[in-house]
Amino acid sequence: MSKLTPESEERLAWLLEPENPSVRYWTLRDILERPEDDPDVCKTRDAIARQPLVQELFARQHPEGHWGDDPAKPYTAEGTLGALSLLHLLGVRPDERTRAGCNSLLRFCQHEGGGFSLTQTRRSGIFPCTTGEHLPMLVHWGLGDDPRVRRAFEFVVADMSADDALDCGRYQHRDCLWGAIAALNGLAVLPAAMRSRQSRQVVRRLADRLLDAKYDFQGEHKRWLTFGVPRVWDLLSALLALAAHGYARDPRFAPLLELVLAQQDERGRWRCGSVSRTWPLEKRNRPSKWVTLDALRLLTTVPKKSR
């Protein structure tokens, strides 16, 4: 069980410290449920734009909209995808610069069928994790109604409907659980008008894959208990994806939640286990505001008796 509730004053005060306006912003919005036009939220978001990292990221953007040396390679460490993902994580407001970046990303990595490819726009470069994971970011940047993004949603629903949808060829033809997390993340922001019986069936199938998986947290899945910044493929990511679709009340969810709760320290904080080498936001093996924020996001979805 959680040693502290999500509303714990000490923990919230730590997350609300002005030194990290991005964590402060998301705490105000997602934990305290302040509206976007709240004066404190607006002030904090203004502070986000003044952060040196945000200014540096935009300074590295090319006039054509992309990041990195080659617009056709958005998946490189300093490429377009990484920059847009980080700006999204930091809570930057959408503007013409982020729109230009999204246009570049869509131009150079979206296959004509709607999926996102690791190899320019080739179908062979599309894996279970490459499309769904980008959709929340694109919706954040205001492209939820863009026909190109709509096609990407349609692709995820159709692609994940196949019996072998999670076989990416890298795990001896076993299900790629990372792909399940990515697809669930994408379908969590599926526009209401696009939701259907088929999309609900896909969500149910993907959720069952994650909840019924035979995890080996002493062996193959040991790294799933190491929580990274930015968020990577781990147990916390899986539970957040499941919770976004209402599975926090599922009996299979509870024992996995206990493993996440067991990782907190005596003050109810979670450590950062891995960081980005290109844009490190925190230090490894230290109490992490970002990981703690995500853990609290998870706890807000869980019935109090389960914490």
Task: Specify the residue positions occupied by each region the protein language model found.
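Preference for long, amphipathic alpha-helical scaffolds in soluble/luminal domains
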Residues: 1-307
